């Protein structure tokens, strides 16, 4: 949340505090269209060793505008379900390779033991379009919901979207971690690494840490499944953290040298050699990493799910409808969504905390979304 706000302010005002900024798939096409960041593909590819064609198509496409690359991907991710195999075995439960959300809810109830600080599932409750909003967005999609219909009428109060939001709130409230509204990615990962949660639905990117016995004492007792579904399949998100070059930068040559080095084919091997482990390398962006014998061996427990998830996502048609007017899986790719997502997730956090009902939170979000459609000229 903090880096997004700081970078957005700097780029939008042309302050030029930074030369290189860390951005994601939501910002890149929007900022490229506004001329805030430079096209970087031709300069990076001027180096014969760089090979931007090595980036996964879904990652490259998400960081491009009109086929031109505007940010160099550091790592990429979809979403998945991590779980403790030992706890499942003890309870006589079996996680399917592709679970449904109804199955996940049943598992969470069965494995929830708060008296012993073991929680059924950890889900992000921290407000923020890229925090709580990311996993919640995939739940909305797979339940058959969406933010807007073809005519840009807000759909938050539609039966499908309402069901998805209430399901998410109920799941984390009844069988999730305490203080969920303060839990983002980092907090949930900490709980998972400490052995306090039986399941964790989040990005595929922490697989490298989760399955590294040097960083996770439970690494030999976990497994990974595909993102859960209900109606729409598949349901994983798509994201990449990438380096973009501010158009107002006065140090572009140095900036390019950094981007080329940090997103090169050789960088993951450098990290592994420097740390003595593959558990800290940036993954999910370059195909060549998965051809590296060392990483292929390390990632054998999770690479098949990660690679298949990245291959099957469709940000152009993430909902259960053919006429959805926006692009994006866990976000709506319009400039106003950053504020809209933040405001709505704040309301949903209020419902999680018990300060208002889920119905009231949903109604408020519906109003915010309608205002955006009208004031933004979409409707």
Task: Enumerate the predicted regions with their spans.
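Hinge/lid segment of periplasmic solute-binding proteins
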Residues: 24-78, 132-135, 139, 219-228, ...
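Conserved C-terminal helix/tail region of periplasmic/extracytoplasmic solute-binding proteins
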Residues: 89, 313-379
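C-terminal lobe and pocket-closing loops
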Residues: 205-218, 231-343
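Extracytoplasmic/periplasmic solute-binding protein
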Residues: 65-74, 79, 103-154, 166, ...
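A structural signal for short loop-to-beta-strand junctions that line the ligand-binding cleft
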Residues: 9-10, 16-19, 48-87, 119, ...
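Short glycine- and hydrophobic/aromatic-rich loop-to-beta-strand nucleating segment
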Residues: 79-83, 140, 243-245
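Extracytoplasmic "Venus flytrap"/periplasmic binding protein-like
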Residues: 1-55, 64, 90-92, 189-191, ...
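Glycine-centered hinge/linker elements that transmit conformational signals in sensory
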Residues: 107-110, 150-182, 223-227
């Amino acid at each position: 949340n903090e880096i997004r706000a700081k970078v957005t302010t700097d780029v939008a005002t042309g302050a030029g505090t930074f030369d290189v900024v860390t951005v994601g798939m939501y910002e890149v096409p929007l900022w490229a269209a506004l001329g805030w960041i430079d096209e970087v593909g031709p300069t990076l590819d001027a180096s014969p060793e760089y090979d931007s064609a090595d980036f996964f198509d879904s990652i490259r496409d998400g960081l491009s505008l009109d086929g031109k690359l505007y940010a160099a991907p550091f790592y990429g991710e979809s979403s998945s379900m991590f779980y403790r195999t030992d706890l499942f075995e003890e309870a006589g439960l079996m996680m399917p390779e592709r679970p449904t959300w109804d199955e996940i809810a049943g598992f969470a109830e069965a494995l929830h033991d708060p008296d012993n600080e073991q929680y059924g599932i950890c889900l992000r409750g921290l407000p923020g379009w890229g925090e709580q909003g990311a996993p919640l967005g995939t739940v909305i999609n797979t339940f058959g919901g969406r933010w807007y219909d073809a005519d840009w009428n807000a759909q938050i109060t539609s039966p499908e979207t309402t069901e998805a939001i209430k399901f998410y709130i109920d799941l984390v409230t009844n069988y999730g971690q305490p203080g969920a509204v303060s839990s983002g990615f980092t907090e949930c990962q900490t709980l998972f690494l400490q052995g306090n949660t039986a399941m964790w639905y989040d990005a595929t990117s922490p697989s490298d840490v989760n399955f590294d016995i040097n960083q996770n004492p439970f690494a030999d007792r976990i497994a990974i499944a595909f993102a859960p579904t209900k109606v729409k399949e598949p349901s994983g998100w798509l994201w990449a953290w990438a380096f973009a070059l501010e158009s107002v930068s006065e140090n572009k040559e140095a900036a390019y040298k950094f981007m080329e080095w940090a997103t090169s084919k050789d960088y993951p091997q450098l990290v592994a050699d420097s740390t003595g482990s593959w558990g800290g390398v940036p993954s999910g962006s370059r195909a060549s990493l998965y051809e590296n014998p060392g990483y292929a061996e390390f990632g054998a427990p999770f690479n098949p799910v990660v690679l298949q998830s990245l291959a099957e996502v469709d940000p152009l048609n993430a909902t259960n409808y053919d006429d959805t007017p926006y692009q994006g899986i866990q976000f709506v790719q319009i400039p106003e969504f950053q504020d809209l997502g933040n405001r709505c997730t704040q309301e949903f956090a209020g419902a999680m905390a018990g300060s208002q009902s889920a119905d009231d939170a949903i109604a408020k979000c519906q109003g915010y979304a309608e205002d955006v459609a009208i004031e933004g000229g979409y409707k």
